[in-house]
C-alpha cells in the first residue's frame, strides 16, 4: 500500500473522529515550539492487542485491549517539557500542548504549516492482523499446533501455545511541521513443550512472527515450530549439566543481539553521547571493538519484528 493510504488510515483513526484538521495541528505545534523553545514534537498513537493461550489441549484464555494517547514534547536547553493526553478531544490536546511548552514561561505561540513526509519503500503492509482471521480460526490454529506437537513423539506430556497480535497507528509531527505516519502490525506464535522420559522432564521452546498477518502462519510454519520445540526438549533430556565459571560465549545473529544491546547499546544512544557521558562519546568512525567484530543493527528487513518505516521522531 502507498504512503497516501497509510496517512489516510492514521488520519481516519486519530484525527477525523475528533474533528481535528490541519489548522488544529498547526495551532498545537505552534504551542509546542513557542519561542524560545528549541525543539518539539507531537506524537499520536493508538494500539490494539489480543492474545490467545492453549493449555492441556484447550484454549483457556484470551484477552483484548486497546489504548490511545497523544504526547507533546518541548525542549529548551537541558530542560524537557513532556505532557500527554489519553483523550483526543481538541481542548484536552491544546491543554497538554501548553503544559509541555510551559518550560518557556515567556514564550509566544504561533502556527506552522504541516507537510507530509513520503515513504519511499514501506517495509511491511499496513494491515490489521487481528482482523486477518476470525476467532474460531485462531482457536483452530492453536489446536492444530497442539495436535502436531503431540504427534511427533510419545514423550510429549505438556503443550502450551500462545498466539498474539497487535495493530498500532502512529502519527508524528516534528518541529518543522513534517507529518510522518506509520501502521505497525505485529504477530507472534509461541510454543513451549515438556517431554518426560524415565522420570526426567525437560522443556523446549520455539516460535516466530513479525510484522505480518496471522495468515502467514501456514501448515509449514506450524510444522517447523512444532519440530523445533520437540527436538530441543528431547536434546535437553540427554544434556549434561553446564560447567560453572567463566567461558567463551559465541553469539549468533538474531535474538543474541539482546545481549549486545544490554552490554553496550545504551552507551550508543544519542543523549548519552550528546552529554558526553558515554564511553563511546567522540568516537564516531573509530574502532571500538575487536577488529574481527562487526555488529549490524538493520531496521529495514522486510516484515521483521524490529523493522520500522519511521522511527519515533518521524525520521
Give residue ranges: language-model regions.
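Active-site bordering "gate/hinge" segments
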Residues: 1-314
Amino acid at each position: 500500500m502507498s504512503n497516501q493510504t497509510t496517512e489516510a488510515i492514521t488520519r481516519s483513526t486519530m484525527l477525523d473522529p475528533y474533528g481535528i484538521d490541519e489548522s488544529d495541528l498547526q495551532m498545537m505545534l505552534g504551542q509546542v515550539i513557542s519561542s524560545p523553545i528549541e525543539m518539539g514534537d507531537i506524537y499520536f498513537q493508538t494500539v490494539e492487542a489480543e492474545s490467545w493461550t492453549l493449555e492441556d489441549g484447550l484454549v483457556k484464555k484470551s484477552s483484548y485491549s486497546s489504548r490511545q494517547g497523544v504526547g507533546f514534547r518541548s525542549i529548551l536547553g537541558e530542560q524537557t517539557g513532556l505532557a500527554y493526553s489519553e483523550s483526543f478531544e481538541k481542548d484536552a490536546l491544546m491543554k497538554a500542548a501548553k503544559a509541555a511548552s510551559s518550560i518557556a514561561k515567556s514564550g509566544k505561540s504561533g502556527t506552522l504549516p504541516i507537510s507530509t513526509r513520503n515513504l519511499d519503500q514501506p517495509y511491511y503492509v499496513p494491515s490489521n492482523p487481528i482482523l486477518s482471521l476470525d476467532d474460531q480460526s485462531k482457536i483452530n490454529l492453536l489446536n492444530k499446533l497442539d495436535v502436531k506437537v503431540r504427534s511427533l513423539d510419545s514423550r510429549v506430556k505438556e503443550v502450551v501455545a500462545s498466539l498474539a497480535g497487535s495493530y498500532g497507528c502512529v502519527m508524528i509531527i516534528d518541529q518543522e511541521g513534517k507529518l510522518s505516519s506509520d501502521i505497525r502490525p505485529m504477530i507472534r506464535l509461541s510454543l513451549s513443550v515438556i517431554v518426560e522420559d524415565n522420570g526426567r522432564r525437560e522443556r523446549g521452546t520455539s516460535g516466530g512472527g513479525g510484522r505480518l498477518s496471522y495468515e502467514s502462519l501456514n501448515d509449514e510454519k506450524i510444522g517447523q515450530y512444532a519440530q523445533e520445540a520437540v527436538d530441543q526438549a528431547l536434546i535437553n533430556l540427554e544434556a549434561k549439566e553446564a560447567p560453572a565459571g567463566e567461558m567463551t560465549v559465541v553469539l549468533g545473529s538474531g535474538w543474541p543481539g539482546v545481549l549486545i544491546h544490554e552490554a553496550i547499546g545504551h552507551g550508543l544512544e544519542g543523549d548519552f553521547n550528546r552529554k558526553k557521558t558515554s564511553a563511546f562519546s567522540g568516537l564516531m568512525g573509530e574502532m571500538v571493538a575487536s577488529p574481527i567484530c562487526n555488529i549490524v543493527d538493520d531496521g529495514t528487513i522486510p516484515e521483521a519484528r524490529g523493522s520500522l518505516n519511521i522511527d519515533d521522531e518521524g525520521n
